[in-house]
Structures are given as C-alpha cells and as structure tokens.
Design a protein with these regions (language model features):
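Glycan-recognition and catalytic cores of secretory/periplasmic carbohydrate-active enzymes
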Residues: 1-99
Length: 99
C-alpha cells in the first residue's frame, strides 16, 4: 500500500510513466491477485513467503497494534483512495469496481 502511494506521489511529481506503471502493477497484485484468495472480499494483512494468506499470524497476540491478527479496516479506505487516484490517471475498468 505504501509503495503504491509512493509511486503515485513520484508520478505526480515527475509525470514519469514508469511510476504509474509500478503503482498499477502493485495495485493489481494486491487488490486483484491477493484478494482472490478471499473470494475478492478483503485484503489480508499477513502473507507467507509463497504469498498465501497467513490466517493465524499473531492470532493470540492482541497486544501488538503494529502487526495485528486479521486486517486493519482503515487499510481498506486507504486502498480505495489510492485506486481512485490511480484511476484518474489510468482509467482501467477494474479500478473503480475494486475501490
């Protein structure tokens, strides 16, 4: 998410299409490929090295606010914002639907 945000900021500053390409690729991999593991419903926070969801990561450690079990609801809002920013400069059909 933060890498996508950085790429979008770099594109805004430079208008270099490479940054927009990277932001698009990152967004596609997270909000389409990775969410396919949850039937397209959610972006999970923690993954294993093989990119499969780690459903149990920190499940029994509720005190760790920086690496919580499950997902952070605010990250859904952040992804929606980033997808809408991306759609402004690269109107791909999946962006609005996924936002």
């Amino acid at each position: 998410m933060h890498a996508t945000e950085a790429c979008l900021a770099a594109f805004e500053a430079t208008r270099d299409e490479r940054f927009l390409d990277r932001a698009t690729l990152l967004a596609d991999h997270i909000v389409q490929r990775q969410t396919a593991q949850t039937d397209g419903l959610m972006i999970w926070e923690h993954y294993r090295a093989d990119r499969s969801i780690d459903w149990g990561y920190n499940r029994h450690n509720s005190s760790n606010i920086f690496r919580p079990w499950g997902y952070q609801p605010g990250h859904f809002t952040q992804w929606a914002k980033l997808l809408l920013i991306l759609e402004r400069d690269r109107p791909l059909p999946w962006l609005l639907r996924r936002a």
